[in-house]
Structure formats: C-alpha cells, structure tokens
Amino acid sequence: IIYANPVKDPHYIKFARTQNVDMMTFDCECELYKVKLYHPYAKLVLRIKTDDSGSVLKFSTKFGASLEEAKTLIEKAKSLELDIIGVSFHVGGKCNDASAYTKAIKNAREVFDMGKQNGMNMYLLDIGGGFPGHESESEVPFEESCKAINDAIDTYFNDIPNFRAIAEPGRFFASKSHTLVFNVIGKKKQIVNGEPYFSYYMNDGIYGCFNCIMFDGQKPEIKAFHIKENDKLYKTTMFGPTCDSVDTIIRGAELPELCVGEWCFVENFGAYTQAAASNFNGFTPIECFYILRY
C-alpha cells in the first residue's frame, strides 16, 4: 500500500503508522517535518511536477516539486534522517500526449541521481495514472502510452538495482465497470424556430453521478432504450432533479422524443461518478446493482 496523497492530515499519518502503512508520498518541506514527527521510519516517495499541458485534468498546479525543489527536499530529508525510496508523478487525468510519460520518467531519473548523491537508495518509480477509461476518452491509444512508458523505463532505469515500477490506473479499471441507468421524471415541450424543443427532468444530475461533467471534464453520451434507428431527433435539454438551475446534464443535444417513465443510459460511467455523488436538496445517490455475466 502507498499513501499517495502528498499532503496529509497529521492524524492520518499517525493512523497509517498504526496500520503499518510505511510508503507515502510528499512534495514539500512541511510534509517532511510532519513525517519526522509522526512516522519517522516511513519509506518516502518524492512527487515531482510534470508537463501536463496535454491532459484534460491538470494536477501539477496543486501537487509536485520541481527538479530544483526536489534537490533541496532530498537534502532536507537527509538532514532529518528520513528515507526516500523513490519518485512519483502524475501526468494529469485523460492524458492526450504519450510523450508526457517519457519526459516525466526522464525527470524521475534525474531525481534518482540526486538521491544517490545524497546516499539515498532509491528503487521505486510510481508513474501515477492518466490512462483513459475507454477508447473515446483519449486522443492517444492506450497501447501508445504503454509503449512510451516501457521504452522510457528501459532507457532511463535499466541500471537501477531492485528497480520496481508501480502505477495508479484508477479510471482505466473503473470506467467500463458501470453503466448508468436513469429515468425521465418530467417533460416540457416548447416550439423554438418552428420546431419542437424538449426539456426533460431526470432522476439524476450534476449533484449525483453527473458531477463528472463539472469536475472531471466528462461529456457523457446519453442513449435511450426502445428507440428505433429512424426515429426523428429533436433539440433536447436534460436537467437533473434538484432546484438548482445549474443542474443541467446536456443542453441542445439531439435525441428522439421521450416519455415520462422512460429509461436512458450512459455506458462506461464508473469513474468519478457515483463516488462523488451527494445528498444535495434531499436527493440520495442512486443505488448500485451488480450483474454477473457468465
């Protein structure tokens, strides 16, 4: 287990120690002092900044040390008699540039060399996540990112004794595991420029699973059951169930006409959806049903 949040509540550091969770990341001097105080025998992993300009979700504005800062942090860790065993990075969510992994791995090797100069025996590389959950989520095929990672590791880490690489591909595993099924609970029809325009009120919205629209940059593809291929399409807006007008799922999309009680669905919807749903306005998150296919 690696405690991969670079900035941790002191109570959580103490709890990690009681559970024998020794591996944890850091990216600043303050964190080193906390670890020294609450978990002095931790195995530390230094998180570095990356070039995440090609990613939809950018993390380096919040986490990670520059190479210059990394050198100072390694020296500080040495003076505090703390053990740094490796380097971590995250190229950002939904990475569309495979070369970002190459650059980050190259920079990680520079940090390994800094550690060696200070008597640190580094052997762990955590390449984070950033992998797409399904094919339509990234401009770069998953295989291309894998090749860039493997080539870079072969180039920059082929001489590190007992070298170990780990990753955190959360979206990659979670996305395809869930299909969201949600229901039309209300309907309005307007005439706009001589054409019908439908507004539907659904039993889930941005305070539920569709929070991913606001916080994860997702653009869900909504489909309806029992729709024929040649059904006429109409301009459509879908709202969530709450009293907030911001609770809008789609606006101006083209869908067939739906009825109250009709069911819609979104495939590949397991990542950063239900996990962040809330009870806002008294609406509870939707229930999850598990289906085993044989």
Regions found by a protein language model. Give the residues of each.
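Charged (often Lys/Glu-rich) extended helix/loop segments that serve as interaction or gating elements
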Residues: 148, 160-294
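Glycine-rich beta-strand-to-loop/alpha-helix junction loops that act as flexible
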Residues: 91-92, 125-135, 169-171
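Acidic/histidine-enriched ion/cofactor-binding microenvironments in catalytic or ligand-binding pockets
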Residues: 38, 110, 119-122, 144-156, ...
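Active-site-proximal beta-alpha core segment in soluble small-molecule metabolic enzymes
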Residues: 1-124
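Short, electropositive alpha-helical surface patch
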Residues: 97-111, 139-150, 180-190
